């Protein structure tokens, strides 16, 4: 890989001062890289997330992927914000194609960015009462409702106090 194939930025998201906020690396690629190479770069950089942005396709949408030092993740808000900060000029918008769907970013004024993430689909946990009983045993509290959003189980508990006790 030549030096010109990748530009790397360290961006502190959600702050206006260096060293604050939530850091992410942004790698602007001149061509796609193999996932193993992206994983190795993310591991070497050592931040919680590294965003890899490819050049835009024919419709202007840029492929975007996120890697932790050990695994690729489906979505990362602060690294998306960091990538948009690196790529969006004062008057532009950016669209990213991700494993979670398309993310649109619009410039708001001189320093603001608005991110529009795809809505996650959540369905009720199909295992019904048996599933709720199993969750109650694991949590020490009976859930009001449980559902799935992708590989994640979402649980509604009866109160904030019940959440604090878990």
Language model regions located:
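Active-site proximal loop and beta-alpha junction motif in alpha/beta enzyme cores
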Residues: 1-75, 79-166
């Amino acid at each position: 890989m030549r030096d010109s194939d990748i530009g790397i930025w360290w961006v502190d998201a959600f702050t206006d001062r260096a060293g604050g906020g939530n850091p992410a690396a942004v790698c602007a690629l001149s061509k796609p890289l193999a996932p193993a190479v992206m994983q190795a770069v993310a591991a070497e950089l050592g931040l919680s997330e590294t965003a890899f942005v490819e050049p835009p396709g024919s419709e202007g949408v840029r492929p975007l992927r996120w890697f932790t030092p050990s695994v690729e993740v489906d979505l990362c808000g602060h690294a998306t914000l960091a990538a948009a900060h690196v790529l969006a000029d004062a008057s532009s918008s950016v669209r990213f194609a991700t494993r979670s769907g398309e993310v649109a970013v619009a410039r708001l004024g001189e320093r603001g960015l608005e991110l529009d993430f795809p809505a996650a689909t959540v369905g009720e946990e199909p295992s019904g009462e048996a599933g709720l009983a199993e969750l109650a045993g694991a949590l020490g509290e009976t859930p009001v409702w449980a559902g799935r959003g992708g590989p994640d189980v979402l649980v509604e508990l009866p109160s904030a106090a019940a959440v604090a006790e878990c």
